[in-house]
């Protein structure tokens, strides 16, 4: 329903590819490009700087990116025609989502497209740490044959701590259980019942770090999680423990991790994501002499995952440009196409009622209360509330207000 206001404009008319333009600014699988060309002129311009993107973004109705493109508030402020930003992947920390919301630009991602790839990379890191595979490989190519030096550890009956039990973390837990590991988890949004279904014992964060032989991180980068894993938390780990991060950069304090490895505070770590990417040449991680495996953000880099996320996000961009709902909207509640179809006339009515209220109110409106009765009460309430807000604010903001930014604009008044 996120594009309901646009569907009212376009009705069932088809968009001409000559009228609509989509910019693809990161490498995207051809399957996704083929979908976009059904409804738009597609320009592929990879490696743009922020200034270059600012200079051209006003020409486009849609933007499709991966992790490389930085969609800052300055870029969004220049996006006069932009309706949707599609992130071919999960994390949207390279998009200023609040700025997009204020501008009325829908942001979508693909939360399930690279689940298997990311989970398998984390598991591969755990196995590589356990059996010293990178070090043994390098030794062989240097002419060595040292079996004693690279004696490893079995994962069977070891304790795996999973921080974040979303789609990726829960899949890691599933495979780890199958390998005979004991899995404990930390996730404040997961119930005891759900954890039991996953065969995961819930723990607080500090206890998880104390008890685990391996800790794997699967959580987003937010102000609350930035540098979450610092020297204090690392010191709570066993000296034989290993740490894996294939989630988002910036969750681990990289200086603290480098120091902890050099001082034998923990046995090892495997890192795929970094606070700043590409990883700088003078990063302290590049100077660690023992126990560290580094990969260049390969978590979602499989043929299958690249294709999955490209198709998923391209379909969402196509649908939104045609006035249909998006499956995985980040900055607005998502609804199925079936519910959207049933809601369309009610959304229009709610919008009209909001406009009527704005015209008959005698002064500044301090509070808006929406009550649903009868047939209305059978539908999800939030879309109807937002439609009412859109109508209410239209008289003051005109075309600047839409279903994406209506709630945010109302809260700011």
Segments the model singles out, each with a brief description of its role:
Residues 103, 111-159, 163, 171-178, ...:
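Phosphate-binding beta-alpha-beta segment of Rossmann-like dinucleotide-binding domains, i.e.
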Residues 107-108, 231, 240-360:
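Rossmann-like dinucleotide-binding domain for NAD(H)/NADP(H)
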